[in-house]
A protein has these predicted regions:
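Class I (Rossmann-like) S-adenosyl-L-methionine-dependent methyltransferase catalytic domain
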Residues: 2-77, 87-127, 131-137, 157-162, ...
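Residues that mark the start of a beta-strand
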Residues: 78-79, 174
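Structural signature of beta-strand start/N-cap positions in the alpha/beta core
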Residues: 79, 100, 144-146
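Class I SAM-dependent methyltransferase core
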Residues: 82
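A short acidic, Gly/Pro-enriched loop at the edge of an enzyme's catalytic core
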Residues: 136-147
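A short SAM/SAH-binding and catalytic strip from SAM-dependent methyltransferases
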Residues: 147-160
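A short glycine-rich, Lys/Arg-flanked "PGG" loop and its adjoining helix->strand segment in the class I
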Residues: 163-175
Length: 290
């Protein structure tokens, strides 16, 4: 499959770019986490260390993979692709549990730091990285992984990029493999949050002022969420744009146990899930041949 490798820029990536620039300053791993860690998991504090940062990822990997039916034994022979690895918060745990891991991100500097993080807290011999240069396509061959995992990443992409990455996930997954993809959908607060986000992203485009705003936590949290996608929107796109010879089965939409979620697409199981943000939902599915 041929891909367009021309780089594209998305304004909501500005905080990641700013954080990525700071990872290249030569500071220690702990200093980098204190300066940029909140971009990935909202943790802050002058005493935050890389080890603390990775421990939060270890816990979430354990919890989510258990909820999705993947214990350590089930992962031992699997190659996992992580869309949106950042500097390796969750990647380290994946390398300790899986046969091999491919970490991808829109920022090449993050991938360099991811390699360093895994070197300290994971198994770097199992890791390779791939830059998502255009924000929408994976520079990987067809049928090369068993699991595609993405958490708190697709919501920061442009809508069309997030949908493209969803079908790209299918493309690179082998027959019988699994998709574990996290999205954000509409909640009442979005009536105010989305217009504020649009305004903030416009401010980020202003020279000097924009760069300063993009490194502040409050500004970033307003402007970095670029889309809202319902399960039916994602499933309709996948149905219409599935890679040749592939389809998804065993489709489950997992949503917060504190909310009610309705899915109109036929053949989809809807399940409540504990400890999930009210605005988030997960798509889990098996990739099969047609």
């Amino acid at each position: 499959m041929t891909h367009d490798n021309s780089p594209k820029w998305r304004t909501q990536f500005t905080p990641w770019k700013s954080a990525g620039n700071r990872t290249e300053t030569g500071g220690t791993a702990d200093e980098v986490v204190r300066q940029t860690g909140w971009v990935f998991n909202n943790e802050t504090g002058s005493d935050l260390t890389l080890a603390d940062f990775v421990r939060t990822g270890d816990e979430e990997v354990r919890r989510y993979m258990h909820q999705f039916g993947f214990g350590p034994e089930a992962l031992a022979n699997k190659t996992l692709l992580e869309i949106g690895s950042g500097i390796g918060r969750m990647t380290s745990a994946f390398t300790r549990q899986c046969f091999a891991v491919v970490a991808t991100d829109v920022d090449a500097a993050f991938l360099e730091r991811c390699h360093e993080t895994v070197g300290k807290h994971g198994d770097v011999s199992k890791l390779r990285t791939s830059h998502v240069a255009d924000g929408s396509t994976l520079q990987l061959p067809d049928n090369c992984v068993d699991i595609v995992f993405s958490y708190i990443t697709l919501q920061h992409c442009e809508k069309n990029d997030a949908l493209s990455l969803s079908t790209e996930a299918m493309r690179v997954t082998r027959t019988g493999g699994t998709l574990l993809l996290n999205y954000r959908t509409w909640v009442r607060a979005d009536a105010g949050l989305l217009p504020l986000g649009i305004a903030m992203r416009r401010l980020w485009r202003i020279p000097v002022v924009g760069k300063r705003l993009a490194v502040t936590r409050w500004s970033t949290r307003l402007g970095w969420q670029a889309n809202r996608l319902s399960p039916d929107q994602v499933l309709a796109h996948i149905s219409a744009n599935a890679p040749s010879g592939k389809r998804i089965t065993n489709v489950v939409v997992h949503h917060s146990a504190k909310t009610t979620r309705t899915v109109k697409t036929l053949g989809v199981t809807v399940k409540p899930m504990k400890r999930v943000n009210k605005s988030h939902w997960w798509l889990t599915a098996t990739v099969e041949g047609v």
